[in-house]
């Protein structure tokens, strides 16, 4: 996720600031991928 209200060290915050650098677009795509995988496990 890219939250402008609470910018991290690189301007973007996610599950882990170390892995979620300043690439908001990449992080959002990664979140979608994780969400799809989680849906498979849940459903």
Swiss-Prot record:
Organism: Raja clavata
Single GO MF descriptor: nerve growth factor receptor binding
Residue spans crossing the bilayer: none
Primary localization class, coarse: secreted
Xref: Pfam families: NGF
Entry keywords, A to Z: Growth factor, Secreted
PANTHER family listed in its UniProt record: NERVE GROWTH FACTOR NGF -RELATED, NEUROTROPHIN-3
Similarity comment: Belongs to the NGF-beta family.
The protein, known as: Neurotrophin-3
């Amino acid at each position: 996720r890219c939250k402008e209200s609470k910018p991290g060290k690189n301007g973007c915050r996610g599950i882990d600031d170390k892995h979620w650098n300043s690439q908001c677009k990449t992080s959002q795509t990664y979140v979608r991928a994780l969400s799809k995988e989680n849906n498979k496990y849940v459903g």
